[in-house]
Amino acid sequence: MDEMDDFFGNDELDREPSPFGEEAIEDNTGEEGSRRIIEPKLLRTKKLTNPRLALNEKTLTGPKGITALREAFQNFNPNPKDDPYKNLEKMMKKYAYWGHLMFPKMKTEDVLNRVETLGTRRQVKLYIMKQRLGESTDDVENEKRETKSKNGIIDDGADDDEDDLFNDLPEKETPTKPINHTEKVVDSPEKKNGQVSNNDAEEEEYRMMEEERLREEQEAREAEAEDELMEDFDLNNDW
């Protein structure tokens, strides 16, 4: 018996450690002498590597949406003498090609049904009305101008020069002569004005950083809203 104890006595020490460390649980509820290790389940975190494409108002009013459809039918002139079904087939091929370029993952009939649903939305109606009136439909530029106008910045359409932005930053002062503390130092008006301009440059830089942060938060909220809209659409439609 002692020999058997010596043989199996160090079984617990010789067993390889579990890859889960101390989280492994030993189950002794079974028969005597039988042991099994219950490993905890790994929590699989869903990592979003690429943003999911969504067929929504933004896509339909973008460069691959209604604008591309108008360009596709710009030179389309059906022959009235031909068979009407042939003309219809040519037209549907253009619709199918346009739908594939805009959203390749969906079938043509599903794309057309989705476009019909989106056509009742206010953003799409406003976009079509602006196109008919010949007004600007560049939503990206309009959003940028609205954001800058809300923050009190007037956008004249000119690009900012990076060199000018860096020139506005305060320069590092290098002392050339040791200051005698016994002498009374009097700041000149030019030096005071330079300090005021440096403070203005720092405030301007901080304001630009704050605007960038707000813009990124707005884009994140819009992307989240688009994902929720697409999830609702997937749940309400059987593909």
Swiss-Prot record:
The keyword Protein transport does not apply. It is found in: Cytoplasm; Nucleus. Residues 1-38, 135-239 are annotated as: Disordered. Pfam families: Swi3 (PF07962). Keywords: Cell cycle, Cell division, Cytoplasm, DNA damage, Mitosis, Nucleus. Residues 1-14, 156-166, 224-239 have a biased composition (Acidic residues). GO terms for molecular function: DNA binding. Signal peptide: none annotated. Residues 169-193, 206-223 have a biased composition (Basic and acidic residues). It comes from the Eukaryota. Its main location: cytoplasm. One of its GO terms (cellular component) is nucleus. One of its GO terms (biological process) is DNA replication checkpoint signaling. PANTHER family: TIMELESS INTERACTING-RELATED (PTHR13220), TIMELESS-INTERACTING PROTEIN (PTHR13220:SF11). Required for normal progression of S-phase. Important for cell survival after DNA damage or replication stress. Belongs to the CSM3 family. This is Protein TIPIN homolog. It comes from Caenorhabditis briggsae.
